[in-house]
Amino acid sequence: MPFEFIDAAHAGQAGSDPLQDELALLDLAAQGRQVAQLWEAPLSLVVPRTYLRHAALETARADFAQQGCPVFLRMSGGGLVPQGPGILNLSLAYTVEQPPGARSDAVYLHLCEVIGDALQSLGVDTHWQAVAGSFCDGRYNLAWGPPEAARKIAGTAQYWRRAPAAMQTADGQRHLVLAHAVLLVSAGPVQINARANAFEAAIDSGRHYDAGKVVSVREALLASGRAVDDDAALMAQVSDALRRSVGQTPPPA
């Protein structure tokens, strides 16, 4: 069964929580649907709920919101993620017949394959690996460049929920999974890292990110000597490539 693309109801609306549409995808997966969504968020930051342990979090959130950069809380783990112009999100929601411990790697690898194939069709070769110094670093980053000097181009995350009783299997192991990736298309690494570092400093987390550890699709294309369209055209080109790749890559069972 191919993925069904769902429009994001509030994508790009200033002040709206971009994660609400994403969580709604799990409700569709609970109906047995296999759904996908491409979306852009307004200028903002997204942090996991584990950041609630920082005493200065709510004060920093209020300060950043006043500056036009709201900070949203998400259900999945990991670290801080910048959002805004030039950044494209891909969310996939579907059912899995086994628990997270058995299939989380497969879910990550599927997401990396979808994005990697899309980027390869545009002339950008990537692979998955950790990139120390990048925001929200993880084992299943999608990275560009040789392994010893790789730069993060996309980050991935996932959130699991047990399937409702109406669609549960006899062994009780059916789950709903929301797999999410954030892809830097034309966003400037210096600008997004400065914003991320300012927030980490405001909550005194001790974290600091290196702009040289991330790269955009635009930068990767230019580095390979390819002509690059304007930002809007490049975003459309990347979106089309992702749609094709999602349609050609079935998820893990």
Swiss-Prot record:
Sequence intervals crossing the membrane: none
GO biological process per UniProt: protein modification process
PROSITE patterns: BPL_LPL_CATALYTIC
Residue ranges constituting the BPL/LPL catalytic domain according to the UniProt record: 30-236
Domain of life: Bacteria
Entries under InterPro entries matching the protein: aa-tRNA-synth_II/BPL/LPL, BPL_LPL_catalytic, Octanoyltrans_LipM/LipL
UniProt name for this protein: Uncharacterized protein H16_B0148
Organism of this sequence: Cupriavidus necator (strain ATCC 17699 / DSM 428 / KCTC 22496 / NCIMB 10442 / H16 / Stanier 337) (Ralstonia eutropha)
